Amino acid sequence: MQWEVVIGLEIHTQLSTQSKIFSGSATTFGSEPNTQACLVDLGMPGVLPVLNKEAVRMAVKFGLAVDAEIGQHNVFARKNYFYPDLPKGYQISQMELPIVGKGHLDIPLEDGTVKRVGITRAHLEEDAGKSLHEDFQGMTGIDLNRAGTPLLEIVSEPDMRSAKEAVAYVKAIHAIVRYLGICDGNMAEGSLRCDCNVSIRPKGQVEFGTRCEIKNVNSFRFIEKAINSEIQRQIDLIEDGGKVIQQTRLYDPNTNETRAMRSKEEANDYRYFPDPDLLPVIIEDSFIEETRATLPELPPQKRERFQSQFGLSTYDASVLASSREQADYFEKVVSISGDAKLAANWVMVELGSLLNKQGVEIDQSPVSAEQLGGMLKRITDNTISGKIAKMVFEAMANGEGSADEVIEKRGLKQVTDSGAIESMLDEVLAANAEQVEQYRAADEAKRGKMFGFFVGQAMKASKGKANPQQVNELLKAKLEG
């Protein structure tokens, strides 16, 4: 039987506010346990929550970025459940009236197409604390520094049909929240976490299958692996005559399997009701328009502009627009070099490889956009060849200065003098007289292969400095003359 996969995602983004959503406690990551939790965060009697206006602004900003309805009358509710790191015995969240309603996001796929994924809603809520199991010899420690940190939970429609589509969607959300400056997107620190709802159904069936939720997956790679593992588990289960049970599961990267955590709760299991300590939030038109005015050019618009303005492919434009820092770097390189396609290739391939090797982001690149742009200009004006450029790039990465300084210091300037190149070619052909005779006696097909040998010898003789185009033209004339 052929199966269709149905995936919906819930993404929890920690908002980059200075203080918590309902208290004045700081939100700095990595502080000593329980040093950033006040009486409100601890759920002590007699204290009242006060809503952080900046968290509201950030939620509205996200809603506008995904063409969503803004809930101008939204309400906080208590989500009741017991967990050791939830001091109040309930979490303040939103249920019936969220701050962000229906929207959508267009995501670029690997095959160059773009898919629209619906966004059901996004709501504000407070994060819980953290349970620490490692250092307490059979006991569990509780760190409440994270309790009360503002979260925006973004819920998608079940529109994705493969793990790769799900990863593309998470990457698109990740890019948007970073562009907007509302979340740092650091998945290793838990700033962005993903719950994956996965079900399968026979191809052509309209009704959804029974879904399972994989909780708190915190990397793009693990999202893909967890979903694929769960898909296979469900297929094997049904094809062996079993039945999928609705449940919450955890992904174990060591075994590449999901395992049952608990039965999946429904909304009414949490006994939601409006929080009596918080008034409904009324958002005025003027607040929405003020926030709209602060929106930057976002990845989808930037991707389209890169395609139309620079003639880039959908894939290249998507990669370059995936982070604000990378897009800015690329545009700076283009403005200096004047060649967008060459700039795209160097930023994505050579620079990308260097950054991966050094384990740094583009804003910490050892080669600045000015340096790279200057070097590419020297390729386009034939001062250096593409091969020599790699040596120059490496030298710049090692702190040897600008491209011009490296070229001058190392004597790497490309030879473009036709007379000098001809003289060098005469020496190469004289040293390989036997091969020259074989070339002249060969048919067209064999000549093509042999020609590469002479080009290689010529470039070796010039130490890579001869202009490759001139070498090709002059060599062809000499061999066939």
UniProtKB/Swiss-Prot annotation:
Enzyme kind, highest EC tier: ligase
Catalytic activity entry: L-glutamyl-tRNA(Gln) + L-glutamine + ATP + H2O = L-glutaminyl-tRNA(Gln) + L-glutamate + ADP + phosphate + H(+); L-aspartyl-tRNA(Asn) + L-glutamine + ATP + H2O = L-asparaginyl-tRNA(Asn) + L-glutamate + ADP + phosphate + 2 H(+)
GO BP of this protein: glutaminyl-tRNAGln biosynthesis via transamidation; translation
UniProt xrefs under PROSITE patterns: GATB
Name listed for the protein in its UniProt record: Aspartyl/glutamyl-tRNA(Asn/Gln) amidotransferase subunit B
SUPFAM superfamilies referenced in this protein's UniProt entry, alphabetically: GatB/YqeY motif, Glutamine synthetase/guanido kinase
EC number from the UniProt entry: 6.3.5.-
Gene Ontology molecular function terms on file: asparaginyl-tRNA synthase (glutamine-hydrolyzing) activity; ATP binding; glutaminyl-tRNA synthase (glutamine-hydrolyzing) activity
Gene name of the encoded protein: gatB
Taxonomy, superkingdom: Bacteria
Species of provenance: Pseudomonas syringae pv. tomato (strain ATCC BAA-871 / DC3000)
Stored Pfam families: GatB_N (PF02934), GatB_Yqey (PF02637)
Subunit comment: Heterotrimer of A, B and C subunits.
Task of the protein: Allows the formation of correctly charged Asn-tRNA(Asn) or Gln-tRNA(Gln) through the transamidation of misacylated Asp-tRNA(Asn) or Glu-tRNA(Gln) in organisms which lack either or both of asparaginyl-tRNA or glutaminyl-tRNA synthetases. The reaction takes place in the presence of glutamine and ATP through an activated phospho-Asp-tRNA(Asn) or phospho-Glu-tRNA(Gln).
Keywords attached to this entry: ATP-binding, Ligase, Nucleotide-binding, Protein biosynthesis
Organism ancestry: Bacteria, Pseudomonadati, Pseudomonadota, Gammaproteobacteria, Pseudomonadales
Family: Belongs to the GatB/GatE family. GatB subfamily.
HAMAP family referenced in this protein's UniProt entry, alphabetically: GatB (MF_00121)
